[in-house]
Amino acid sequence: MDFPGFKNSTVTVDGVDIAYTVSGEGPPVLMLHGFPQNRAMWARVAPQLAEHHTVVCADLRGYGDSDKPKCLPDRSNYSFRTFAHDQLCVMRHLGFERFHLVGHDRGGRTGHRMALDHPEAVLSLTVMDIVPTYAMFMNTNRLVAASYWHWYFLQQPEPFPEHMIGQDPDFFYETCLFGWGATKVSDFDQQMLNAYRESWRNPAMIHGSCSDYRAAATIDLEHDSADIQRKVECPTLVFYGSKGQMGQLFDIPAEWAKRCNNTTNASLPGGHFFVDQFPAETSEILLKFLARNG
């Protein structure tokens, strides 16, 4: 999906093409999507930010127009550490050594890892509608498991989830898209939905998304356990949907206060995909936070 006024391109990182779109002038902002979306999720937000910033919206490896390599046995090529390295290389390719990072869902987890691994690069971090990966796994109970069942389904050994999803990818991914609290089909722009469907009908994307969750339950959890005493130092916006399942199951601000030294909290009365429900309000909150931490 093309954004008006944005230029599409790719950067090759260790043999993997990472797709992105860029526009605007001013302090750089990297925007990263989550599951099961791609960079199209920012279509109604990025143009507003580009009036004041250089905005880069990229696809994570395994998603959208980025390459979708076969997962390695140790899952390292789908770890958040690798995702973060990919995106750092995109920004350095564009000439940005330091930048703001806005991440929803898996993009937020990628941002958390980047802020730990490359603190010199991240001017500010925005994490959208998540708690840290470690907290998700360590605090799973019957309510969390019932709401976030896909975390445990997608991590099952190949080819079980790939085969099941592949029978009807629209049904599976749309169950996720419309099932995580206060979101309905009319909240999503039709062009954006078309971009998501085109992506997730690709068997390689199905494998990529499963690999992402397999990595989270193994190598990412190992990395997070090793870094449990470390905190993010940059200004961090904790932004979530107050009517979503994450906001109802967790004290999201409290969880991030354990992992970050400088947090600001914001919420909108939506679900997990509050960006789609409230694009104008999302843009306004982001612009104010970025201006304060420019």
Curated annotation (Swiss-Prot):
Residues 27-277 form the AB hydrolase-1 domain. SUPFAM superfamilies: alpha/beta-Hydrolases. The active site is at residues 105, 272. InterPro entries: AB_hydrolase_1, AB_hydrolase_fold, AB_hydrolase_sf, Epox_hydrolase-like. It is an enzyme of class 3 (hydrolase). It comes from the Bacteria. GO terms for cellular component: membrane. Its EC number is 3.8.1.3. One of its GO terms (molecular function) is haloacetate dehalogenase activity. Disulfide bonds: none annotated. It catalyses: a haloacetate + H2O = a halide anion + glycolate + H(+). Keywords: Hydrolase, Plasmid. Coiled coil: none annotated. Two haloacetate dehalogenase enzymes exist in Moraxella strain B. DehH1 acts predominantly on fluoroacetate, dehH2 acts on chloro-, bromo- and iodoacetate, but not on fluoroacetate. Belongs to the AB hydrolase superfamily. Epoxide hydrolase family. PANTHER family: HYDROLASE, PUTATIVE (AFU_ORTHOLOGUE AFUA_2G14860)-RELATED, MONOACYLGLYCEROL LIPASE. This is Haloacetate dehalogenase H-1. It comes from Moraxella sp. (strain B).
